[in-house]
Amino acid sequence: MIIEGPVIKFGDKIDTDIIIPARYLKYTDPQYLAQHAMEPLDPEFYKKASKGVIIVAGKVFGMGSSREQAAIALKAAGVKAVVAESFARIFYRNAINNGLPVITLPNSTKEIDESSYVKIDVETGEILVGNKVLKGKGITGMALEILQAGGIMEYLKKMQTVNRN
């Protein structure tokens, strides 16, 4: 699974309240949530991300309260993947379960510039930035299968169909 796109860069400790502010949690429409993704840091994020971007961030991306809407909002906004030094465990699983690839890369914010265009091999974790290949932590096994299906619901539908035949 190869993903590529331009980078939008954030720092450390981007919590779920920044990814999607609590006042929007009562809404379920992914496109509405997308319009408010990252709003506290960048009110224009939705417009920038709509062309398909890769977020590069620092440590503990997705920390804070558990809210599935964070991954949903990012994906619906046009985020193709998130590369970070580390992720909050619950955000990481929510992202996978919603079909949003998340790649752990030590020193990600030092290795990748805001103006970069990156190409990511999700399975191996290799990230091509210009002429440089960076080695992140790839996604394998069932997590990769869930991503390839488009998320946990699509994966379960696929497995149900396979088991019927």
Swiss-Prot record:
Its EC number is 4.2.1.33. It holds the Pfam family Aconitase_C. Keywords: Amino-acid biosynthesis, Branched-chain amino acid biosynthesis, Leucine biosynthesis, Lyase. It comes from the Archaea. Heterodimer of LeuC and LeuD. HAMAP family: LeuD_type2. This is 3-isopropylmalate dehydratase small subunit. It comes from Saccharolobus islandicus (strain M.16.27) (Sulfolobus islandicus).
